[in-house]
Curated annotation (Swiss-Prot):
Keyword list, A-Z: DNA-binding, Transcription, Transcription regulation
UniProt organism field: Bacillus subtilis (strain 168)
The keyword Aminoacyl-tRNA synthetase is assigned to this record: no
A Pfam short name: FCD
Gene3D superfamilies associated with the record: GntR ligand-binding domain-like (1.20.120.530), Winged helix-like DNA-binding domain superfamily/Winged helix DNA-binding domain (1.10.10.10)
Gene: ycbG
Presence of keyword Glycosyltransferase: no
Name of the featured protein: Uncharacterized HTH-type transcriptional regulator YcbG
Sample GO molecular function, one term: DNA-binding transcription factor activity
HTH gntR-type domain ranges (all copies): 16-84
DNA-binding region range list: 44-63
């Protein structure tokens, strides 16, 4: 029997909270050393029996872990901790904070603000061209459907810093982009384009100070809008 799995409390707990508890128990297998990167997890039936949870709750938890790169589910092959998860502890931390959107937003701000200043020194012309394309895609989008182009804009900047230490962190964080994106109560395409243009101009001029300033203004705007929307629910 795996330690730390059998004590899940299910009384008067809603499904979302219960799924988070399941995530915590599964991650515990890794952090406690009972299982290691690349190891196979117990089957769904075994986990349901051990944790006393329904299949929908378990699958919601497993889906979150898979999205964040903590596990891989293979058809008819079972579920495994990813081979490189030991090199990406940030993915595990995000898995444990999936229901704490303000914390995820602030983590994203802290990371991206540092990366954009480095990007101002390292970004190349090809990456600048790709950035411009995302801005054009957003400007030309219909019905404000520009989530992927928005995500790509931030991904290009983050990876242009060319720092392998933080690359895994930003990739994990950007995976949560869709969750953050879904919390925006309404979109303002023209405002997004304006913010992105200012960031682009600062990067093109190799100005880390203005790049930092405009990225902060952009992310603060997004954060405040999301938090306001959450308060109104």
């Amino acid at each position: 029997m795996y330690e730390g799995l059998e004590d899940l409390k299910v009384d008067t707990v809603n499904r979302k909270t219960l799924a988070k508890q399941v995530i915590e128990r599964i991650v515990h297998l890794l952090s406690s050393g009972q299982l290691r990167a690349g190891d196979k997890l117990p089957t769904e039936m075994e986990l349901m029996d051990i944790l006393h949870v329904s299949r929908p709750v378990l699958r919601e938890a497993l889906s979150s872990l898979e999205t964040l790169g903590v596990i891989t589910r293979k058809t008819r092959g079972g579920t495994y901790f990813n081979d490189k998860i030991g090199m990406q502890p940030f993915s595990v931390m995000l898995a444990l904070a999936t229901d704490n959107l303000p914390a995820i937003i602030e983590a994203r701000m802290a990371l991206e603000l540092g990366l954009v200043t480095i990007a101002a020194e390292k970004i190349n012309e090809e990456e600048l061209q790709r950035l411009q394309k995302t801005i054009d895609d957003i400007a030309n989008s219909t019905d404000n459907h520009y989530g992927e182009a928005d995500k790509e804009f931030h991904r290009i900047i983050a990876l242009s810093a060319n720092n392998p230490v933080v690359e895994g962190m930003i990739q994990s964080l950007l995976i949560t982009h869709a969750k953050i994106d879904s919390q925006i109560p309404y979109r303002e395409r023209d405002v997004t384009v304006e913010y992105h243009k200012k960031i682009y101009d600062a990067l093109a001029k190799r100005d880390p100070y203005k790049a930092h300033y405009h990225m902060y203004e952009h992310l603060k705007f997004v954060r405040d809008k999301i938090l306001k929307g959450m308060d109104e629910k």
